[in-house]
Amino acid sequence: MENAKMNSLIAQYPLVKDLVALKETTWFNPGTTSLAEGLPYVGLTEQDVQDAHARLSRFAPYLAKAFAETAATGGIIESELVAIPAMQKRLEKEYQQPISGQLLLKKDSHLPISGSIKARGGIYEVLAHAEKLALEAGLLTLDDDYSKLLSPEFKQFFSQYSIAVGSTGNLGLSIGIMSARIGFKVTVHMSADARAWKKAKLRSHGVTVVEYEQDYGVAVEEGRKAAQSDPNCFFIDDENSRTLFLGYSVAGQRLKAQFAQQGRIVDADNPLFVYLPCGVGGGPGGVAFGLKLAFGDHVHCFFAEPTHSPCMLLGVHTGLHDQISVQDIGIDNLTAADGLAVGRASGFVGRAMERLLDGFYTLSDQTMYDMLGWLAQEEGIRLEPSALAGMAGPQRVCASVSYQQMHGFSAEQLRNTTHLVWATGGGMVPEEEMNQYLAKGR
């Protein structure tokens, strides 16, 4: 971006100056509205989420047999919800900032099959595509026991088709493993940030991995191009896919059930704050949409991004969405949080969700490493750096009197708050890699 343009952008949006300086930045969204007002802009409804829920239930018998690790839950891919009181104390001590209410962790980091939040959206979109093909071919009806998809006949049928996706790692892992298990030929286009172990794991499942020297945007573009030349190839578009988004959104109702099971109340007097790491935006956007449908205006969602990849904060704050990238303002998009190394946000998610998100913030790689170490020490839970992005949220919210006043929170409400950090990945990180992460914390 030429200087004059840059100066006028900063004059209009002074916060951009802090982003350019790679400062840890927090922006509370003044444009937040009620669910009733914001919902029409999403372009999807509660019915769409129910359909996704039903589809996952139809596939449950198949998943229970296809992946032994899902047998115990009857083929439902869901993660634990745990309180992390020792981590809460540690954060308060390290940051000299009390966190009112209770701190919880949602362990999508340990979801079965692929060990990340992408096991929600990625697997769902592969299943939705497989179902569509099998129904159209007359090989399947909605009332069938879907475990029949494991038969050689179906493997043979699906092998005529291929799937392609561009990824920084975790989405590729989910889509690659699932597609290969069903019988699709699958190619994952991996950006420069992708970890070597993720590529190796994919190849061990018979997935074709194409590696790029460039970032996420290039990997997605190349994947899209390669798929266009083959009519039997389906490209899963992380930037714009409504199907992926709906796969994530099912988490809302599931979390509501977990809260009920644990006797946790969410209402006007007991607000829920949820902190979601954000890359291109599909995962956190879909989850936030599902949470809003489940808890209405009593849930407040925040997106967390690396200081080197603040694409969603930049896009929503300036209103430019996918028309601007972090590279345009001189930021390099290089971060240890490989799952969040995205320079240009999803235009679909930003525009759909901007009225339903309470805020956005950035944090440095070092902050993620520090918190990664503290969580391992205090709670014995090991995550990858990206998954710690949400952990900085509770301090930011509790420290901001202006945000609390903007929403009219009383001291009583804040005392009754639940802070939920969404841990997005790390359950499958190899030991030696994890030890390198732990060594970087202070």
From Swiss-Prot:
Q: Which NCBIfam families match?
A: D_Ser_am_lyase, PRK02991.1
InterPro entries, per database record: D_Ser_am_lyase, Ser/Thr_Dehydratase, Ser/Thr_deHydtase_PyrdxlP-BS, TrpB-like_PALP, TrpB-like_PALP_sf
**EC numbers on record:** 4.3.1.18
Molecular function terms, GO-annotated: D-serine ammonia-lyase activity; hydro-lyase activity; pyridoxal phosphate binding
The protein in question is named: D-serine dehydratase
**Reaction catalysed by this enzyme:** D-serine = pyruvate + NH4(+)
Q: Which HAMAP family does its entry note?
A: D_Ser_dehydrat
What's an example GO BP annotation here? Answer: isoleucine biosynthetic process
State whether it acts alone or in a complex, and with which partners, per the record: Monomer.
Mark the residues carrying the PTM N6-(pyridoxal phosphate)lysine. Answer: K118
The UniProt family comment states:
Belongs to the serine/threonine dehydratase family. DsdA subfamily.
Q: Which PANTHER family match?
A: D-SERINE DEHYDRATASE (PTHR48078:SF9), THREONINE DEHYDRATASE, MITOCHONDRIAL-RELATED (PTHR48078)
| Alphabetical list of Pfam families matching this protein | PALP (PF00291)
Q: What are the names of the required cofactors?
A: pyridoxal 5'-phosphate
Which keywords appear in this protein's UniProt record, sorted alphabetically?
Lyase, Pyridoxal phosphate
